[in-house]
């Protein structure tokens, strides 16, 4: 490494200097090794890992690798033992020519952290090239007049090796005339010459064949030979002589063709043709015969090709001057041409990618790539500086001479810029300067930093009921700004339970397309609104997701035919037997057909038609179009048939309409043969006060108590529900949309069906409370104000009724036959308040046309819905002291009638009773107290047939 002489330095001090020197070499990041050329594959060069201070176990994890600009495949490192070895054939002459120094520069790169070490491996020469003569045969013309000791220069051999391996010795084959004078020192300045030992005698020996052998100084020795053909000439005994034996000339490498290098001059002391000289080129080294020309007459040497300083810095030209004597004589000289450098080479840029692509969350100062620059020129022309494209989040950092690192300068965002095209510019210091560029494409790798996003927070979907299983009802789509698997969105249901069933039993979502399918036919009567959430989640790590709300409204279809309710004659749909006295007059109600429809809206609006009698005969009966009441059209007489078979067609208003047929058998009897129920009815009709003492009065009282308890329970339950955290239900936030199958006239199935349940502004009004079991979620406060109808004091939010609130078996037997809405029903908000159109229950009237134009009460409400009604059933208001015609039983569509009829009218006691306003209730109580005596008298006759209820 270095040598030290002991000049008074002690051994400890010398060791300290050696230790400091060793630390200096390690800190500089350079190692030096040597290897012989032509070494076999696997030849040991050095323990590079140990010398660099690296552990063998960390070579592979730290991506230990060796790189070389031009000779990367000659040497390799075994990552198992950290040994640098020969990987392929090394030819020193091919690498460095005859340069005295020859080394291979390596870059050792390791990651985590990134470190770069520089290693120089010196290639030692071996004797692998024999001496070579440029010609296989050299011809010499020697005049016989030559004196002894005359010298004849020969072209020596060349050896591609260096130092001792290129040190040549010559020997001449045995002969009596010539000896060989060869160079004896290492520099070999002395020319190889053939020396004449004694005079020649052409007549005796006109020609000589000699062999010159060149031997190098290597071990083992290698030799080369050339044949010398010596022809002995006569007379001409003076050689041409140059002014100098050697010439030195400097020439710019960009010299143009035909540029004069120099003009040689040789003279011959002979006279005549023996003194005329011609010039010729013997050799130009190295390989420059095509670069120069020599005029054989005037001795001018000119440029004939393109000179390149980077290829050869010197040329050696051997020139021979020959006279025209017989035999001709020759003189020799050497011309040394030095090539001067010009800035004719652009810099070269080499980029080694290390960390591409770059993650968008990479930290600043992250090394992206290594860049090396070089320039084949020398001096200032070979000094190179680098620059980078401006306004990019990267920068160049110089790590070593002509080596740079491309590092991250600021944060990246792939969603803004997904790739950068960087231009590295290398510029030399020449005048004018030359430059070169290299492009580096830096792709930004995606990181999962964006969640899938839906276009809307919620969607409203309308689906008709009875859809086929697997029906596609909607498609959700979410967009993810990331790329590849980070943008691969999959969809799934946010599972929850709907009652006792899981949401996944109703709908499913295709994981890839986002298509929402109904797994089973939906039933409007069972489920009007299906609200659920769909989750979109990407495939990144960790995955990100978002939810969207779907409100699926199930639209009603006319899929339920009218159903006849049970009558006193037997099961539903059976024939009803009625006995009618012949003495009744026109308008007498004989019977009432009761039917319900499970559909809603127009699909549940029922109408009744009396089928024509057989044979086309006219019958004295008709049926109310919407009431189902069968009444007489005229007074009966003896001419009428004693038995009538009436077929009543019950039809809804759906498309197509569905029907049911009820059979009523009417028997005309004499007044004395009428049943007791009819007698009781007649008595009640004759005495209006006696009807109030009927058992129905007790039923009214019981119903009032039960209804009050139900209302109180409902209000308490609603208050507790609204005070809790709203999730889903009557008080939950959202944007409900009501589904309306159609709207006709002044009636529509709209927001008017709602009444406030859980408002924070005070107790609800008692004028009307309407509950629907399948309305969507309530509005928020802003939307409540927008949707509130004029004249309405409080916006309402419906709630699902308790499924336990059902009418009893005794009440179910007397359910009203036709439940519908009045077209002109009037709701009064209070004294002087504005009137509103609200769905009500029509009162049965003796007039056949009364209430027959009303829309259905079940528009959107099934048979399990229940409604409190306070107010009249038609525009006609009850007068003071009058009782309301009907009351609606909470939890049941049944109507109990307490309407008073004329004495000659027969009213079916199965009509349901409706509740009037508070004032009317008080009036009824007064009437009840005023008729206590009559109530006791009629107590024995108060038992009625349950079928009439």
Swiss-Prot record:
A Pfam family this chain is assigned to: Cadherin_2
Localization in the cell: Cell membrane
GO terms of biological process kind: cell adhesion; homophilic cell adhesion via plasma membrane adhesion molecules; nervous system development
Per the record, what ranges lie on the membrane's Extracellular side?
A: 30-696
Keyword Nucleotide-binding among UniProt keywords: no
Q: Where is this region: Disordered?
A: 753-807, 826-858, 870-889, 900-949
Q: Give residue ranges on the Cytoplasmic side.
A: 718-949
Give the span(s) annotated as 6 X 4 AA repeats of P-X-X-P. 733-893
Annotated GO MF terms: calcium ion binding
Q: Which residues are glycosylated?
A: 265, 304, 547
- Topologically, how does it sit relative to the membrane? Single-pass type I membrane protein
Instruction: Spell out the residue ranges that the record assigns to PXXP repeats.
Output: 733-736, 773-776, 795-798, 831-834, 872-875, 890-893
Q: Which InterPro entries match?
A: Cadherin-like_dom (IPR002126), Cadherin-like_sf (IPR015919), Cadherin_CBD (IPR031904), Cadherin_CS (IPR020894), Cadherin_N (IPR013164), Protocadherin/Cadherin-CA (IPR050174)
Q: Give the main location.
A: membrane
Q: Which UniProt keywords apply?
A: Calcium, Cell adhesion, Cell membrane, Glycoprotein, Membrane, Repeat, Signal, Transmembrane, Transmembrane helix
Biased composition annotated in UniProt, kind: Basic and acidic residues: 780-789, 908-922
Q: Which residues form the Cadherin domain?
A: 30-133, 157-242, 243-349, 350-454, 455-564, 580-677
Alphabetical list of CDD domains matching this protein: Cadherin_repeat (cd11304)
Transmembrane residue ranges: 697-717
Q: Which residues constitute the signal peptide according to the record?
A: 1-29
GO CC, sorted alphabetically, is: plasma membrane
Database matches in PANTHER family: CADHERIN-87A, PROTOCADHERIN ALPHA-11
General function of this protein: Potential calcium-dependent cell-adhesion protein. May be involved in the establishment and maintenance of specific neuronal connections in the brain.
Entry protein name: Protocadherin alpha-11
> Which organism does this record belong to?
Pan troglodytes
Lineage, broadest ranks: Eukaryota, Metazoa, Chordata, Craniata, Vertebrata
